[in-house]
Amino acid sequence: MDASLITEIRKIVLQLSVSSNGSQSKEIEEIKKQVQVNVDDIRAANIKLDGLGRQIADISNSISTIESRLGEMDNRLVGISSQVTQLSNSVSQNTQSISSLGDRINAVEPRVDSLDTVTSNLTGRTSTLEADVGSLRTELAALTTRVTTEVTRLDGLINSGQNSIGELSTRLSNVETSMVTTAGRGLQKNGNTLNVIVGNGMWFNSSNQLQLDLSGQSKGVGFVGTGMVVKIDTNYFAYNSNGEITLVSQINELPSRVSTLESAKIDSVLPPLTVREASGVRTLSFGYDTSDFTIINSVLSLRSRLTLPTYRYPLELDTANNRVQVADRFGMRTGTWTGQLQYQHPQLSWRANVTLNLMKVDDWLVLSFSQMTTNSIMADGKFVINFVSGLSSGWQTGDTEPSSTIDPLSTTFAAVQFLNNGQRIDAFRIMGVSEWTDGELEIKNYGGTYTGHTQVYWAPWTIMYPCNVR
């Protein structure tokens, strides 16, 4: 490939790199095809040269054979050798030229590839530019449409404004022909407002109607609807169909009602009736001796002067039958108490569920304990029974209140057995009622025989105390 061809290729490449014509890719493809054809031609020439080299080698062998066989042909062979040498030199020069051409082609191929890459980039940029140009054309078309629309709308507004101005001119002419510029008698013009001059005795009502002002005039005259009328009290007066003032029916009946009252009037009263008047109120009253009579539930009753005797327990008055009898709660009455028996000591305390039998005999309350086994006790301490709850039906907490506060109220001996390691040791405890507070009864353990133990077996025992609460 000669220098002029390379120079021409470079010019074409430069023109393609600068040009933005969309046909550049086709021209590059044509160049690539032409280069490929040249490469193919060079390769075919190399193949032919290789064939010539082999033929020359064959000829050299033939010449050597001829030289060995034909000595007499030396001069001719020398001439042939010179020719062969020249041919060989020419072939070598051709080979070098072909090699140089191959190197130049190899150098051109990367540049052609680079040119292909640049061409691809140019193609992408050209496509982007074409897309941007298309978008600009679309926006320009939309803008053109909007401008056309706005121009049309402005034309419409201008036409409408011209019509409105024409209408305003016509209306202004009409106003000018009918406009009030001066006010006559009884009227006053204030700017664009025409006022009615109202003197004393006139006013505008809530409906903006001009009426007579009677507020400072005679009483009893006013307006009803659109007319002026005489004011009346409708409780006693009314207008008839002729507009005359008449009495209402209640007033018309007054004479007959007064006559009825006069016919039933009591002119005087006789004792024990009296008439009293206070603060304008007349009251008919019945006179009676308050020491003998009294008024109970608005009924005059005879006052009893008898003094009823008082009764002490066990007697009581049966007011229903007006008789004196022995109180129902006097005599013997039985019941039960079920709850927790509490043992209290500074060093020991426990609770046990028990049921006590109660018996009220005259003024004494008997507590009967059944046999039971409890936890251990100390040498003293106290047992507590709470009668606030647990009493059987018919018994009240107050029924257990002692009649005295002496400590102890009463005492008794309780037989017990102290249980210790399977042994039973007979003993007794001295028990006494010591205190009763708000339904809580305390039974003290005042002592007795005592020994170490783990449990206590209690034989049945009773204790009683005076209980004649009145």
UniProtKB/Swiss-Prot annotation:
Residue positions the entry lists as glycosylated: 21, 121, 205, 353
Region of interest called Head, as start-end residue ranges on this chain: 325-470
Gene Ontology CC terms, in alphabetical order: viral capsid; viral outer capsid
UniProt main location, coarse: virion
One Pfam family hit: Reo_sigma1
Coiled coil location: 26-46
Superkingdom of source: Viruses
Localization: Virion
Region (Tail): 1-324
Signal peptide: none
Keyword Ribonucleoprotein: no
InterPro entries: Adenovirus_pIV-like_att, S1_C
Gene3D superfamilies the UniProt entry points to: 1.20.5.340, Designed single chain three-helix bundle, reovirus attachment protein sigma1, domain 1, Virus attachment protein , globular domain
Keyword Coiled coil tagged: yes
GO BP field: cell adhesion; symbiont entry into host cell; virion attachment to host cell
Keywords, comma-separated and alphabetical: Capsid protein, Coiled coil, Glycoprotein, Hemagglutinin, Host-virus interaction, Outer capsid protein, Viral attachment to host cell, Virion, Virus entry into host cell
Modified how: Undergoes dramatic conformational rearrangements during viral disassembly in the endocytic pathway.
Family: Belongs to the orthoreovirus sigma-1 protein family.
Assembly description: Homotrimer. Interacts (via the head region) with human F11R.
Function of the molecule: Fiber-like molecule that attaches the virion to the host cell membrane by binding to the primary receptor F11R/JAM-A and to sialic acid containing proteins (coreceptor). The interaction of sigma-1 with F11R is required for NF-kB activation and apoptosis. Binding to both sialic acid and F11R is required to induce maximal levels of apoptosis.
Protein name, per record: Outer capsid protein sigma-1
Name of encoding gene: S1
